[in-house]
Each structure stands twice: as structure tokens, then as C-alpha cells.
Amino acid sequence: MMRFMFLVASLLLCAAAFGAEPVVQLNSATVAPREIEDNTEKAVVRDYTRAWQSLAIALSENNSAALANDFVGQAQDELQQRVSAQQKSGLHTRYIDHGHNVQAVFYSQDGSAMQLRDTARLEVQMLDGDKVIHSDQFTQNYLVVMTAGDARWKVRVLQALPAK
């Protein structure tokens, strides 16, 4: 029985680290020059959530193909380079996502692009095989540009901002 309880607890911890959706809260009250439609706001939250899940999978499994559906342009290029560097070093990164407070800053007149500011609470673990060699919990601010395309929003820019 104890062995079974340990297995269940281990599975729950893994699900929390890898499978759980990050919580993304979007505030669009001050966006300019136009308001965000309700359906668009829901789509942005859904797709930004998926992007963070894809990022976590790509860096955990050292698999840049996981980025293809959610990232384009600069963000995709930079993350692919990071995956490549990890592959060369033999390390991988585990993201444990504790949520995102996202502020919509700009929504283009034609509805094709949106700028966001994200305050993300993250735990990042560097692993060599199964061994954690470094772990850090922090809050990171990001400048994000998302563009519409193929019936979904994709992250074009994901730039970490320096601490104030």
C-alpha cells in the first residue's frame, strides 16, 4: 500500500510540473488603440498558455519541434538556439510555472498584432540527466508580441526584461 501511495504522489508531482496548465490572467482594461473583443481575449489567453506549455516541453525534452505551433520569428529562433545549446551540453531545463499576470498594452487597428507585458512566477531547474544541478524560483517580467495567424495567436517576441 505504501508503495502505491508513493507512486501516486510521484505521478501527481510530475503532473504538476509538466502537465498542468499555467494560470494566465489577462488584463485588457487599458489596451490601445482599440479594445480587445471577448473571443480574441479568450483566444490570446488560450494560445499564450499553450505557448508556455510548449516552451516547457521543448526545454525539458530538448526538442525544438515542440515550439512549431506556438512560436514564430524571433521568439522561435531564440528558443531553438537555446534547445540546440542544451543538446550540445547534455543538460535540460524544467519549468514549473506558477502563473502569469499579463497586461495588454497594444492591439493593432487591423487586429493582427498585440503587445503584452507578462509578470511570470517561475521555478526553473537545470538538470543533468535526472539530477537537478541548479534550481531557482523568481518573478520575471517579459515583453511579448503575439501575432494572429492560422486560426491561433503565436508568440513572435518573448523578451525577458531586466529587473527594476
Language-model segments: residues:
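Short solvent-exposed loop/turn micro-motifs enriched in small/polar/acidic residues
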Residues: R50, H98, Q137-T139
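Exposed beta-sheet edge and beta->alpha loop/turn motif
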Residues: G111-K164
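Positively charged n-region of N-terminal signal peptides that target proteins for export
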Residues: M1-M5
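Residue-level detector of secondary-structure transition/capping positions
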Residues: W52, A75, L122-V124
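N-terminal signal peptide c-region/cleavage motif recognized by signal peptidases
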Residues: C14-A15
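Short solvent-exposed beta->alpha transition segments
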Residues: E35-N39, S64-Q109
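Short, low-complexity N-terminal intrinsically disordered segments enriched in polar/charged residues
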Residues: G19-G73
